[in-house]
């Protein structure tokens, strides 16, 4: 039979080392939840399986050719064979005719569906929004716990974290293309924070739409001599004799990593600030919770909810924001 939500979620929800750590919108809670949390996967809603949208490629004999989701080694997958909102729901303009948000959709033709229909993510299980590797290696007892989420904010192996629930997504223009930092290809940096992954588009890009993203900030090791992002050897012996989680020596772990990846390591390291963005497509809320419902412009405007500069504006365009 076809894979179930449990098959897919076991790996994808635990990416990053724990439940909902990485993505923010894919948690184990999706296995058995309500439409209040996710209208598509709620057992009292669509009760859909992941493969209903994330499809695969098969040959003429029906044999599996490809998982259907490209970009597997990277931070965020390509669309592959994935269905989009309009494949099931129809044209954005026509579906909102006669609804309380018709005017809003007519005024905002570059808003992707997810912007309004995912007002927040990590609405059930908290997600990491900050991660500081520089703090790793300390013997701290007792381990501090975030009072709001009940999750530890420190791990000797991984450093210090910030956990959040009900995170308002960061909005950026997106046309499906990314700038990604990749080892031995474009792994050097010239300014801080180091942008590990970000959509390439801006408001001038033809066909680009505004989409929601999870913004992840933190710090991680880099070569102080040649300003190159490094890959530390964390565990096991395949990557060398000095895993960080075994000896807690960054210098040795980074040398192991460089030997394995073929990077040049000068022997001097530092921790640099980093930022990356990940797509947000799950946790679609019931339509009554959508941003702008009943003409509620204040859901986005006249406050600090939106980073208008990231969208190419000098500020909120409603009062006085302008573009070049």
Which stretches of residues belong to each language-model region?
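C-type cytochrome heme-c attachment and multiheme electron-transfer modules
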Residues: 1-324
